[in-house]
């Protein structure tokens, strides 16, 4: 009960003293009620306080007047800011209170502050205009840009705004600017996307390492935040090569077809993209096969281009572009830790690359080899040097992070007498005839190693050593050589000589002193030596790159186009909407230009001919005939691949495995003439199976089994054909590029004598049909009558898949192939033989097959290929034992005694790589 009066007394205010001034009471009311609740302007309070700076107000706040009521004073401190409803009012009140304490002598008016802020904003916008530019696809770290702004404010003696305010100022200048969060997990940072630093800006070199001597220059900036994971090639998946020089901008010498050049450059870019994709996937051994298939499988009509000096130089430029992208992909410029297995694979790849290129260029013009090999050697040397440096950096990094090791190295290096070593170095060059004043002296050597000691004392990282070496080489080699016009190579040799000698003498002293850190210092010295060699080689390679650039400028009509082609950076397939109409993901080669096909019913009252682009089908089955559009058509044929067989060239040795037709001389076999014979196919290469749902083009058609779709999707695109073992005649007219003309017969696989053909009772003009099965081959055109014989061609007879390399008339060559392209990201693997998948028990082995007397059980031995019959006969059903003339299937396995021996090993000879010339022959032939 005694505590109650105490509590009451605690809240009882003391008797106000008559000495308290009215101004002090007003100030108390201001803090209690808030300035918004006063009935008089608040300036009156501050004017009174300004008139009496040492009066009661200032004393009350300092607690110098004991007469001030204690209760009111407590409430003043407890209610500070609680009664203010607006943040701006509170900030204004606090600022005015502080200004009053400073006697308001240096306080700026609000108007003056607004003027200064507006002026600073204008200066900032002008600074942004001078140093930055809109650049699509470029990311700039937000922290770097703000650091540049702080440097600008320091130089201009301005008060910098906060990061948020500066961000608003940037968007005033670049309204379309966006932000992205980039970086590894745990170390990601915000970046401005769509803005870049101008080359004329002072900040350009510091960010983009323009003054850096190697790819690793500026890695201190790139490595900000460190790395927690090892480098993986999978992070580069989707990398696309930049654009190669366009044939439209080239200045040709002599009579050269622009279409052929364009085709060749397109072929070579796809070839280079395949090399890049396999390098990213780690399939380095597959790259050798791509090289062989491209160069040894070059079409004959493009071979003369390889002797043209302009084309050879363009190849060199393209090689330089490929090698730069390969280097960026294989070796990270951020000096990220790499797995040992990846380093070993890259070393092995660099070791074998030159030999792979040389072997692939056999039997080709020597001028091409002489120009390509020097570029190859520079690439290999650079790859080896960068791999070695990166490996040493990974080993040296833990040593530099170990404080005990660093202290030991500093202690041991302090015992080395650098002056005595400098004197020895001076003696070694005393007999030199070089009298230039800027020669690298012993003083420079001592200075350099003194800087090295300072870096060790500061616990410098690998990136700091790189930055220091860049400065050393720049100041003592490159800059001096430019000033006096001395050869860079000569200057670099002198520097390396003295650097190596001085380093060897330092290691000699450490050995004599029994330094405990000898191993660690030896590792650091190896790292520094390797980087200096890399910096020198990079400078020499840059000079060679400039020569290629000048060469390209000479051949290009537009110099800007040549510079853009040579300096373009690789992109990513994830940045572009590629393959919008792509088919199944397993497709390796996709048709991209399918012809929209019209279908007309065929009736008995329609005896006329059909246009070449129309496909007849029975009128009675129109309700069940599915009409497919472009997408369905591509899906139905998407599983077919281009046969991976290079043409058999008469002038070349068998450098590569060219499949079953390798080694067939083109001179063997008669020159085909109309009417041409239909080829019979080895039974082991083209096995067939019964099929209940047989269509116009059966899914198990006679093409190589390794390229047959697995599993076989049923195709319902075309109606049934009524003729068993017969095929319709194809027209003699010249067809478009997507059509093939030819006469074929559904002859049995075993040999049978030709039989006479009686005229058909129904006459009808022939029509042509679209050739959809691009995976099939050995189809020959015919300009003769609509009849063909069932004779068997010898195994050595030429096949008509590849153009002019086979000796038959131009009229028998196939038309242009359907436009195709190889998938950019695809790993090519060897496909198992057909029997390993569908016949693991060898049930269908040739020796165990039952010999049949005839391939067509329901037809006579004389099977004719004649003109189509009328619609009434087209609607008849097809027995299960029928065959659709080269496209269809059969449930019987014929005896083929003449080709058993040849077909036994043909499956093993099939190569798994699609030849580049088969993909582009259509475009090349069309451009001739």
Swiss-Prot record:
InterPro entries: DNA-bd_RFX, RFX-like, WH-like_DNA-bd_sf, WH_DNA-bd_sf. Residues 124-199 bind DNA. It comes from the Eukaryota. GO terms for cellular component: nucleus. Residues 1-22, 53-102 are annotated as: Disordered. The keyword GTP-binding does not apply. PROSITE patterns: RFX_DBD. Transmembrane segments: none annotated. Residues 92-101 have a biased composition (Basic and acidic residues). The keyword Transcription regulation applies. GO terms for molecular function: DNA-binding transcription activator activity, RNA polymerase II-specific; RNA polymerase II cis-regulatory region sequence-specific DNA binding; transcription cis-regulatory region binding. Keywords: Developmental protein, Differentiation, DNA-binding, Nucleus, Transcription, Transcription regulation. It is found in: Nucleus. GO terms for biological process: endocrine pancreas development; glucose homeostasis; pancreatic A cell differentiation; pancreatic D cell differentiation; pancreatic epsilon cell differentiation; positive regulation of DNA-templated transcription; positive regulation of insulin secretion involved in cellular response to glucose stimulus; positive regulation of transcription by RNA polymerase II. Transcription factor required to direct islet cell differentiation during endocrine pancreas development. Specifically required for the differentiation of 4 of the 5 islet cell types and for the production of insulin. Not required for pancreatic PP (polypeptide-producing) cells differentiation. Acts downstream of NEUROG3 and regulates the transcription factors involved in beta-cell maturation and function, thereby restricting the expression of the beta-cell differentiation and specification genes, and thus the beta-cell fate choice. Interacts with RFX3. PANTHER family: DNA-BINDING PROTEIN RFX6, RFX TRANSCRIPTION FACTOR FAMILY. Belongs to the RFX family. This is DNA-binding protein RFX6. It comes from Ailuropoda melanoleuca (Giant panda). The lineage of its organism: Eukaryota, Metazoa, Chordata, Craniata, Vertebrata. The gene is RFX6.
């Amino acid at each position: 009960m005694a505590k109650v009066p105490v509590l009451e007394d605690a809240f009882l205010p003391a008797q106000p003293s008559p000495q308290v001034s009215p101004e002090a009471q007003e100030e108390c009311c201001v803090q209690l009620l808030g300035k918004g609740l006063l009935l008089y302007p608040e300036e009156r309070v501050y004017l009174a306080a300004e008139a009496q700076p040492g009066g009661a107000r200032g004393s009350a706040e300092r607690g110098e007047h004991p007469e001030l009521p204690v209760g009111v004073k407590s409430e003043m401190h407890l209610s500070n800011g609680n009664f203010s409803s607006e943040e701006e009012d509170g900030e204004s009140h606090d600022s005015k209170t502080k200004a009053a304490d400073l006697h308001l002598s240096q306080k700026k008016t609000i108007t003056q502050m607004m003027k200064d802020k507006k002026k600073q904003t204008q200066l900032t916008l002008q600074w942004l205009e001078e140093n930055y530019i809109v650049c699509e696809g470029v990311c700039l770290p937000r922290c770097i840009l703000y650091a540049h702004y702080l440097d600008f404010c320091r130089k201009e003696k301005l008060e910098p705004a906060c990061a948020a305010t500066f961000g608003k100022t940037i968007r005033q200048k670049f309204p379309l600017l966006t932000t992205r969060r980039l970086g590894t997990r745990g170390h990601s940072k915000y970046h401005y996307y769509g803005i870049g630093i101008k080359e004329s800006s002072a900040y350009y070199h510091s960010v983009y390492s323009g003054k850096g001597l190697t790819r690793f220059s500026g890695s201190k900036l790139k490595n900000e935040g460190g790395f927690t994971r090892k480098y993986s090639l999978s992070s580069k998946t989707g990398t696309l090569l930049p654009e190669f020089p366009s044939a439209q901008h080239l200045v040709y010498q002599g009579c050269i077809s622009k279409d052929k050049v364009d085709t060749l450059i397109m072929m070579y870019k796809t070839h280079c993209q395949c090399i890049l994709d396999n390098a990213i996937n780690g399939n380095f051994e597959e790259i050798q096969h791509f090289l062989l298939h491209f160069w040894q499988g070059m079409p004959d009509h493009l071979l003369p281009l390889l002797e043209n000096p302009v084309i050879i130089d363009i190849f060199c430029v393209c090689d330089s572009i490929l090698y730069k992208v390969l280097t960026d992909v294989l070796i990270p410029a951020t000096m990220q830790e790499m797995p040992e297995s990846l380093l070993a694979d890259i070393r092995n790849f660099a070791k074998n690359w030159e030999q792979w290129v040389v072997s692939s260029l056999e039997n080709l013009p020597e001028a091409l080899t002489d120009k390509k090999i020097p570029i190859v050697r520079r690439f290999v040397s650079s790859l080896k040097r960068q791999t070695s440096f990166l490996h040493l950096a990974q080993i040296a990094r833990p040593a530099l992070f170990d404080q005990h090791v660093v202290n030991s190295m500093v202690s041991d290096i302090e015992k080395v007498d650098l002056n005595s070593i400098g004197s020895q170095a001076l003696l070694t060059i005393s007999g030199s005839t070089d009298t230039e004043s800027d020669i690298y002296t012993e003083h420079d050597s001592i200075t350099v190693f003194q800087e090295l000691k300072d870096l060790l004392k500061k616990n410098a990282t690998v990136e700091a050593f790189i930055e220091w070496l860049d400065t050393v080489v720049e100041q003592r080699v490159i800059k001096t050589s430019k000033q006096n016009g001395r050869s860079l190579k000569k200057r670099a040799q002198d520097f390396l000589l003295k650097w190596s000698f001085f380093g060897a003498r330092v290691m000699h002293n450490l050995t004599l002193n029994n330094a405990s850190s000898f191993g660690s210092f030896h590792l650091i010295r190896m790292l520094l030596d390797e980087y200096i060699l890399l910096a020198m080689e990079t400078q020499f390679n840059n000079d060679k790159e400039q020569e290629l650039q000048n060469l390209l400028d000479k051949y290009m009509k537009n110099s800007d186009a040549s510079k853009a082609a040579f300096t373009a950076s690789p992109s990513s397939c994830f940045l572009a909407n590629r393959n919008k109409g792509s088919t199944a993901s397993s497709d390796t080669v996709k048709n991209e230009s399918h012809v929209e096909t019209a279908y007309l019913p065929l009736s008995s009252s329609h005896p006329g001919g059909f246009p070449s682009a129309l496909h007849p089908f029975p009128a009675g089955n129109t309700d069940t005939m599915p009409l497919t559009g472009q997408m369905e058509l591509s899906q139905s044929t998407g599983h077919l691949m281009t046969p991976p067989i290079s043409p058999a060239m008469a002038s070349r040795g068998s450098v590569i495995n060219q499949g079953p037709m390798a080694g067939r001389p083109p001179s063997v076999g008669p020159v085909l003439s109309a009417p041409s014979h239909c080829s019979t196919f080895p039974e082991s290469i083209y096995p067939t199976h019964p099929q209940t749902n047989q269509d116009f083009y059966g899914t198990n058609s006679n093409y190589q089994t390794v390229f047959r779709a697995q599993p076989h999707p049923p195709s319902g695109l075309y109606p049934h054909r009524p003729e068993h073992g017969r095929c319709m005649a194809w027209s003699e007219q010249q067809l478009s590029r997507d059509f093939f003309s030819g006469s074929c017969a559904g002859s049995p696989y075993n040999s049978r004598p030709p039989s006479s053909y009686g005229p058909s009772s129904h006459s009808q003009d022939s029509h042509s049909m679209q050739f959809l099965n691009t995976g099939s081959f050995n189809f020959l055109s015919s300009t003769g009558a609509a009849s063909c014989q069932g004779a068997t061609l010898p195994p050595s007879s030429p096949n008509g898949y590849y153009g002019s390399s086979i000796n038959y008339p131009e009229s028998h060559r196939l038309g242009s192939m359907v436009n195709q392209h190889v998938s950019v990201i695809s790993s090519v693997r060897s496909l198992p033989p057909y029997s390993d998948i569908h016949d693991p028990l060898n049930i269908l082995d040739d020796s165990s097959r039952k010999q049949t007397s005839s391939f067509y059980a329901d037809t006579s031995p004389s099977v004719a290929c004649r003109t189509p019959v009328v619609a009434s006969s087209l609607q008849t059903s097809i027995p299960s034992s029928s065959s659709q003339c080269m496209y269809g299937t059969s449930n019987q396995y014929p005896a083929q005694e003449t080709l058993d021996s040849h077909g036994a090993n043909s499956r093993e000879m099939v190569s798994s790589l699609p030849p580049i010339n088969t993909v582009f022959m259509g475009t090349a032939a069309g451009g001739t």
